[in-house]
């Protein structure tokens, strides 16, 4: 995401809202990520701009209320006529179904498109992968789903 932002390949209104179980501030997240970001001196100001657009919500994977809070946080930034939402999921198979149900039931935007990016491989084997695909098909339309390889993510 940093490289896309750095190279001006994202819409100027883009915001990033992270969600995970770990209680972190954006400053702590920035500190943890910095060694991997490869920021040269010419882009340090742009790097700070990037982090100013980042927000973070800590919550459980199985708590509907936590996903309602995530939805509220995302909603704070939807001020225009159109607001698209893209959810990037990199989850352990054990919580995948629960999280996707909560996203579907509490976090889908009403003012634009919603996209779900699923990082493959998901599941433990072919059977569990097929089961997760069937689960996703019950929640989202195919044009909402994007499956990408782990190494591309």
From Swiss-Prot:
Keywords (alphabetical) are: Carbohydrate metabolism, Cytoplasm, Glucose metabolism, NADP, Oxidoreductase
MF GO annotations? glucose-6-phosphate dehydrogenase activity; NADP binding
Annotated InterPro entries: G6P_DH (IPR001282), G6P_DH_NAD-bd (IPR022674), NAD(P)-bd_dom_sf (IPR036291)
Q: Which GO terms describe its biological process?
A: glucose 6-phosphate metabolic process; glucose metabolic process; NADP metabolic process; pentose-phosphate shunt, oxidative branch
Give the enzyme's EC designation.
1.1.1.49
Pfam families according to UniProt: G6PD_N
Could you give one GO CC term from the UniProt record?
A: cytosol
Q: What class of enzyme is it?
A: oxidoreductase
Query: Which residues does the annotation say bind D-glucose 6-phosphate?
Result: 120
Look up the record and name the pathway of this protein: Carbohydrate degradation; pentose phosphate pathway; D-ribulose 5-phosphate from D-glucose 6-phosphate (oxidative stage): step 1/3
Reactions catalysed, semicolon-separated, are:
D-glucose 6-phosphate + NADP(+) = 6-phospho-D-glucono-1,5-lactone + NADPH + H(+)
Superkingdom of the source?
Eukaryota
Q: Where in the cell is it found?
A: Cytoplasm, Cytosol
Any idea which positions bind NADP(+)?
21, 120
Query: Which Gene3D superfamilies does the UniProt entry name for this protein?
Result: NAD(P)-binding Rossmann-like Domain (3.40.50.720)
The family database entries (SUPFAM superfamilies) matched by this protein are listed as: NAD(P)-binding Rossmann-fold domains
Q: What is its main location?
A: cytoplasm
What this protein is reported to do is described as:
Cytosolic glucose-6-phosphate dehydrogenase that catalyzes the first and rate-limiting step of the oxidative branch within the pentose phosphate pathway/shunt, an alternative route to glycolysis for the dissimilation of carbohydrates and a major source of reducing power and metabolic intermediates for fatty acid and nucleic acid biosynthetic processes.
Q: Which family does it belong to?
A: Belongs to the glucose-6-phosphate dehydrogenase family.
Q: What is this protein called?
A: Glucose-6-phosphate 1-dehydrogenase
Give the organism's phylogenetic lineage. Answer: Eukaryota, Metazoa, Ecdysozoa, Arthropoda, Hexapoda
- By which gene is this protein encoded? ZW
């Amino acid at each position: 995401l940093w490289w896309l932002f750095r190279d001006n390949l994202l819409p100027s209104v883009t915001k990033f809202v992270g969600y995970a179980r770990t209680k972190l501030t954006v400053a702590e997240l920035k500190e943890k990520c910095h060694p991997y970001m490869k920021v040269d001196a010419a882009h340090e100001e742009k790097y700070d701009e990037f982090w100013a657009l980042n927000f973070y919500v800590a919550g459980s994977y199985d708590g509907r209320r936590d996903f309602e809070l995530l939805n509220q946080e995302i909603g704070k930034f939807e001020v225009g006529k159109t607001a698209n939402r893209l959810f990037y999921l990199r989850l352990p198979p054990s919580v995948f179904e629960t999280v996707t149900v909560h996203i579907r039931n509490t976090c889908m935007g009403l003012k634009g498109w919603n996209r779900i990016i699923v990082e493959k491989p998901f599941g433990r084997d072919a059977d569990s992968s097929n089961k997760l695909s069937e689960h996703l098909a019950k929640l989202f339309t195919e044009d909402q789903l994007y499956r990408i390889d782990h190494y591309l993510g």
